[in-house]
């Protein structure tokens, strides 16, 4: 009985420590937990389809709205997707305290390389929500500068307001000196935001990097978003030289919990028109 209990405890300990996990993609903080969703009855050996890399917001996860709904709806349209937890988030390796936008861009670029390596992928699109929108926009710009632009880009309530928050010394309930923040602050009283994040976010060239991407763009923003102001999406529209489209979803909030189906529909229909 004691031996059996010991074996169970040992297994649980190794599982919690992450030794039982296997990662296919790695970012600067380590292995990235990811999930590929394919269209129904899709044969990876003989079929081809486009794929969209889905990026969640700060403190969020690949398993939190709106990411799972996006993946499911894309699959119904014959489009595959990759969703993943950024380094330091949930099931990925790393520590939230050491997360930065720059590191998340590296995570996204690693996912891009993985998507390119999949033999069944025809085209690649990017989608980001909140801070994930900032990451997606800058990743698209970096890729465009390299000569390998994504085929389409969707930004849902892109959270470029993070830069103003860090410069202003207030971030999700945490207050700090922008010029000399502590080692970390606690957002919502529990989530650690590191000094490196606060300082580096102030120096980001968000729009300058994003504008290198000249492919098709759709922005989606809820009219009742109390976290990321509409002006962030409007600034992205002004930044892009191409015809970037902004769709305002009446009554929707930042977390996409009121009009989820409508938001998903706007995103998926855009990808269907651009990738297939």
Question: What residue ranges belong to the model's regions?
Answer:
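Catalytic nucleophile-loop/oxyanion-hole region of alpha/beta-hydrolase
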Residues: 62-63, 89-119
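The serine-hydrolase catalytic nucleophile loop
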Residues: 59-71
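Conserved alpha/beta-hydrolase
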Residues: 71-93
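N-terminal cap/lid segment of alpha/beta-hydrolase-fold proteins
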Residues: 19-45
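Catalytic histidine-centered segment of alpha/beta-hydrolase-like enzymes
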Residues: 252-263
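Acidic catalytic loop of the alpha/beta-hydrolase fold
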Residues: 224-228, 255
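Hydrolase active-site cap/lid region
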Residues: 145-195
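Short beta-strand/loop motif that positions the catalytic acidic residue
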Residues: 213, 219-221, 225
């Amino acid at each position: 009985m004691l031996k059996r209990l010991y074996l169970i405890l040992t297994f649980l300990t190794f599982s919690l420590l992450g030794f039982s996990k296997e990662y296919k993609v790695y970012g600067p903080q380590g292995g990235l937990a990811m999930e590929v969703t394919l269209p129904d009855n899709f044969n990876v050996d003989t079929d081809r389809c486009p794929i969209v890399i889905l990026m969640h917001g700060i403190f969020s996860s690949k398993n939190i709205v709106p990411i799972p709904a996006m993946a499911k709806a894309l699959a119904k349209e014959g489009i595959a997707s990759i969703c993943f937890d950024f380094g330091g988030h949930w099931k990925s390796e790393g520590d939230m305290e050491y997360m930065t936008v720059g590191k998340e861009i590296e995570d996204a670029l690693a996912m891009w390389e993985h998507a390119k390596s999949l033999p069944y992928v025809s085209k690649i699109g990017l989608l980001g929500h909140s801070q994930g929108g900032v990451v997606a926009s800058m990743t698209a710009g970096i890729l465009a500068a390299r000569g390998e632009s994504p085929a389409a880009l969707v930004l849902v309530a892109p959270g470029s307001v993070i830069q103003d928050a860090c410069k202003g010394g207030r971030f999700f309930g945490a207050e700090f000196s922008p010029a000399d923040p502590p080692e970390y602050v606690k957002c919502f009283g529990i989530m650690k935001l590191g000094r490196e994040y606060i300082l580096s976010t102030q120096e980001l060239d968000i729009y300058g990097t994003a504008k290198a991407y000249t492919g098709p763009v759709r922005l989606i923003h809820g009219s009742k978003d109390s976290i990321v102001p509409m002006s962030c999406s409007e600034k992205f529209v002004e930044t892009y030289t191409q015809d970037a489209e902004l769709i305002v979803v009446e009554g929707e909030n930042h977390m996409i919990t009121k009009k989820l189906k409508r938001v998903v529909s706007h995103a998926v229909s855009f990808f269907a028109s651009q990738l297939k």
